[in-house]
């Protein structure tokens, strides 16, 4: 899980609370019931707005990466100069990963060359940091556009392709994810390079995650079932996972109110 807070009311205090949850995603009592120790279960990263990176870095150990949403999130329609500057500032502030937002207009206008050049420039600005290209699948109109945008972003240097900002009317689902996974597989067959996949938006239950895990396993195989190549972007998913583990260990569900969210 990329444990995420990307709301208009985000504050330093809210990020600090999220980081505490990231450090202890499952309560100590529940870990004991499961026969696990603190550190056995860890989030993939903490994802925040670029201006809150320092706050996240201050409250997290080095083994938990901080991902910053940059490039005019969520619309991706700021000027190119401004969006590129956000990447530079995010890295200066300590971001380990950069989630970029593509300009969906390039896709809708079939301007694939411009999309390639922009993502390649963002990759160059990010230097050695991993970038996740957010396609905004709900805005791309057709699955053919989703497929083409996926391939262009991978060719331009994206380390991950991500379904959504979470702000669109249509976010990650099995249909658009299948298309993206098929493109990842095709790219791997052509180049030998593995690209990561990040579904995001509306994923709030463990049951839904299992469906995505099965899809990734069927399309790409076991090598992709790890944080290096698979992340789930979510803000409330961890609460449901903890409830399911509670049920597994104790035979009953805990009320959500009794599970710490930060």
What are these regions (language model features)?
Residues 9-41, 50-197, 204-235, 243-262:
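Alpha/beta enzyme core
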Residues 240:
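N-terminal beta-loop-helix "entrance" segment that forms/cooperates
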């Amino acid at each position: 899980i990329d444990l995420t807070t990307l709301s208009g009311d985000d504050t330093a205090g809210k990020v600090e609370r999220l980081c505490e949850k990231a450090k202890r995603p499952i309560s100590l009592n529940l870990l004991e019931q499961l026969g696990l120790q603190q550190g056995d279960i860890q989030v993939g990263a903490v994802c925040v707005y670029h201006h809150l990176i320092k706050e996240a870095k201050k409250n997290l150990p080095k083994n938990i990466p901080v991902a910053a949403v940059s490039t005019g999130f969520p619309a991706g329609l700021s000027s190119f100069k401004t969006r590129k500057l956000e990447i530079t500032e995010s890295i200066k502030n300590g971001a380990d990963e950069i989630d970029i937002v593509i300009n969906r207009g390039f896709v809708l206008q079939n301007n694939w060359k411009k999309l390639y050049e922009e993502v390649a420039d963002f990759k160059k600005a990010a230097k050695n940091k991993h970038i996740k290209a957010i396609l905004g699948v709900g805005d791309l109109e057709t699955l053919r556009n989703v497929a083409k945008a996926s391939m262009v972003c991978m060719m331009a240097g994206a380390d991950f392709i991500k379904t959504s900002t979470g702000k669109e009317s249509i976010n990650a689902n099995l249909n658009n994810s299948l298309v993206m996974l098929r493109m990842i597989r095709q790219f791997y067959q052509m180049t030998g390079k593995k690209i990561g996949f990040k579904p995001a938006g509306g994923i709030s239950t463990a049951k839904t995650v299992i469906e995505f895990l099965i899809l990734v396993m069927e399309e790409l195989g076991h090598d992709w079932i790890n944080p290096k190549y698979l992340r789930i972007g979510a803000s409330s998913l961890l609460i449901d996972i903890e409830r399911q583990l509670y049920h597994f260990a104790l035979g009953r569900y805990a009320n959500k109110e009794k599970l710490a969210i930060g």
